[in-house]
């Protein structure tokens, strides 16, 4: 059931069937096996244009329904469908979000600053691959010290398994994960465990199968595409309704499902030339809902533009978002622990790049990018942005999964190198994000997988993936077929690893680092001006200060000794670390956190 500006409000088992179909000549509702002719909704204002209504149809929960446009015989699913129990091509089913009896009345939410995020994919996080099964791991995550769980997209897609970025029904939760009721249970359980939930959402494109939005109206800009297909119509004719559709989806997650924030996928692909960018509207809506609900709500943008305007307040022409990803941190860490310098890693081949990121947030803040062949980014105004607004990681779903074989750092690097990456991520000035399994050095890959039922689409996806890496010099024989079910199965975590050998040792280090971060305010609370960095590229060491806390890292394959060791050893990644009043000694591939 769809009602303009109202999709995110609980229906409480009643309502009416409304649909926006401005180009249709006739619209028929098929509900509960009966047909109802719809009429144009009364009203002369722009908000009423193109809307059809069937006020006499039976309403309530668990009614199967769809729409027939211009005499069609096959009904289309609702663009705002909450449930698709038989798949994205089938009838929609009504769902009453108000039926869930929430148990989280005492939940006050969490602020981004000072928090640690854990990114996970429901389908591969547990053997069962469901929301209910993932809820069984919440105590583990709370014990690790996590504050926010960030879920990869859960909206409905065609097939049984997918990363989630091929979603076509933004208001529906994938039935294979348990559907919308399971999602509510998961959020409720997360809050009971003291964990916030951030939902990854995709508003820059729709998937290749099951996208019926163009049948209803000008949701897309045909011929104006991005990497994934036609762009969403944010600024053309009819875009007022399209924008409201998206804003209602934002409100649905934050209000109906009580999530604590959204991760906004690839906002650089949101083509919006209107005076008020839709990201600004997102920020204003989140602030309003935060005031209404009495808890913080966090919007985090994924952007490769290195543009701090995303974070600046709206009253100074910013978008007012709480955070954005910083790929530069990932690249600098990856190069210095792995030695890879190809492709977009080429500009980060020194400890100097890592030092600049730690000091300034971005490496490319107006500097020349050899990978792009042009200057890139702009500097951050330190008086307007706290370092915690930058979300950083040493691994994430993109940076692992978009490698040819989906290999993690832990599949090729020793404990010492993984420990260096962990220390940089969890003691640096930014908000750290872990990718599922990283904390124990998972050796299961995270590969690109799909399950398109259409043979031609599946074949095209697999061939395109192989061609992409063949152009980069990879042997096509080593690139996994995304349509092979084994590619999905291989990507599931093996939780038995977490208790064995160096896996258990690394897991204990992550717990200790998160505990130290929480108990040492300088690590998470100080601003950009409170970070100082020294390094020696030839000797391969780097150290930085956050107020009265010093972090020393040895990237070399030989021991080092440095002066000014501080007064107390707070944490070491290796038992062979030694310090006295004169020097601190670090074995190869090790780090220490010191109190000055």
Curated annotation (Swiss-Prot):
Q: Which InterPro entries match?
A: DUF3459, Glyco_hydro_13_cat_dom, Glycoside_hydrolase_SF, Ig-like_fold, Ig_E-set, Trehalose_TreZ, Trehalose_TreZ_E-set_sf
- From what organism does this protein derive? Rhizobium sp. (strain M-11)
Gene name of this polypeptide: treZ
Q: Name the pathway it acts in.
A: Glycan biosynthesis; trehalose biosynthesis
Q: What is this protein called?
A: Malto-oligosyltrehalose trehalohydrolase
The set of disulfide-linked cysteines is none
Q: Name one GO biological process term.
A: trehalose biosynthetic process
- List the Pfam families: Alpha-amylase, DUF3459
| Site-annotated residues for Transition state stabilizer | 398
Where does the record locate the signal sequence feature? Answer: none
Active site at which residues? 265, 302
Gene Ontology terms, MF aspect: 4-alpha-D-(1->4)-alpha-D-glucanotrehalose trehalohydrolase activity
């Amino acid at each position: 059931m769809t009602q303009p500006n109202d999709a995110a409000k609980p229906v409480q088992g009643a309502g009416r069937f409304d649909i926006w179909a401005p180009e249709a000549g006739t619209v028929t509702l098929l509900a509960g096996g009966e047909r109802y002719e719809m009429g144009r909704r009364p009203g002369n204002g722009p908000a009423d244009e193109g809307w059809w209504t069937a006020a006499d149809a039976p309403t309530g929960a668990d009614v199967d329904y769809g729409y027939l446009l211009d005499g069609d015989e096959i009904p289309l699913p609702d663009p705002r469908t909450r449930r698709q129990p038989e798949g994205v091509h089938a009838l929609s089913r009504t769902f009453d979000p108000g039926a869930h009896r929430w148990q989280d009345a005492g939940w006050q939410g969490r602020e981004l600053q000072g928090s640690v995020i854990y990114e996970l994919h429901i389908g591969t996080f547990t053997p069962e691959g469901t929301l209910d099964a993932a809820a069984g791991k919440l105590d583990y995550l709370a014990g690790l010290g996590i504050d926010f769980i960030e879920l990869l997209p859960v909206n409905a897609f065609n097939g049984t398994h997918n990363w989630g970025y091929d979603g076509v029904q933004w208001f529906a939760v994938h039935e294979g994960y348990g559907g919308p009721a399971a999602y509510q249970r998961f959020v409720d359980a997360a809050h009971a465990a003291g964990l916030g939930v951030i939902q990854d959402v995709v508003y820059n494109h729709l998937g290749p199968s099951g996208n019926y939005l163009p049948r209803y109206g000008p949701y897309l800009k045909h011929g104006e595409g991005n990497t994934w297909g036609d762009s969403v119509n944010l600024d053309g004719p009819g875009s007022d309704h399209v924008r409201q559709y998206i804003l209602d989806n934002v409100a649905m997650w934050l209000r109906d499902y009580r999530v604590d924030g959204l991760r906004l996928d690839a906002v650089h692909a949101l083509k919006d030339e209107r005076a008020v960018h839709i990201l600004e509207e997102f920020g204003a809506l989140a602030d309003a809902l935060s005031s209404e609900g009495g808890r913080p709500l966090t919007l985090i943008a994924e952007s490769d533009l290195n543009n701090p305007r995303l974070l600046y307040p709206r009253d100074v022409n910013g978008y007012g978002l709480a955070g954005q990803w910083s790929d530069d941190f990932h690249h600098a860490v990856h190069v210095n622990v792995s030695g890879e310098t190809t492709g977009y890693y080429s500009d980060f081949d020194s400890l100097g790049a890592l030092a600049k990121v730690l000091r300034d947030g971005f490496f490319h803040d107006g500097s020349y990018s050899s990978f792009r062949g042009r200057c890139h980014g702009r500097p951050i105004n330190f008086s307007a942005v706290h370092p915690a607004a930058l979300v950083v990681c040493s691994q994430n779903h993109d940076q692992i999964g978009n490698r040819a074989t989906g290999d993690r750092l832990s599949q090729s690097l020793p404990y010492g190198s993984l420990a260096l990456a962990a220390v940089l991520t969890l003691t640096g000035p930014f908000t750290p994000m872990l990718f599922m399994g990283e904390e124990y050095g998972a050796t299961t890959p995270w590969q690109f997988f799909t399950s398109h039922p259409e043979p031609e689409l599946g074949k095209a996806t697999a061939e395109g993936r192989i061609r992409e890496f063949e152009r980069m010099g990879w042997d096509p024989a080593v690139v996994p077929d995304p349509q092979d079910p084994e590619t999905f199965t291989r990507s599931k975590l093996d939780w038995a690893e977490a208790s064995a050998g160096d896996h258990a040792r690394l897991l204990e280090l992550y717990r200790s680092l998160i505990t130290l971060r929480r108990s040492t305010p300088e690590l998470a609370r100080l601003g950009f001006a409170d970070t100082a960095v020294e390094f020696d590229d030839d000797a391969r060491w780097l150290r930085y200060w956050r107020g009265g806390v010093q972090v020393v890292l040895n990237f070399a394959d030989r021991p080092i000794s440095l002066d000014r060791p501080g007064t107390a050893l707070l944490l070491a990644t290796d038992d062979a670390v030694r310090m006295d009043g004169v020097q601190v000694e670090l074995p190869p591939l090790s780090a220490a956190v010191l109190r000055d």
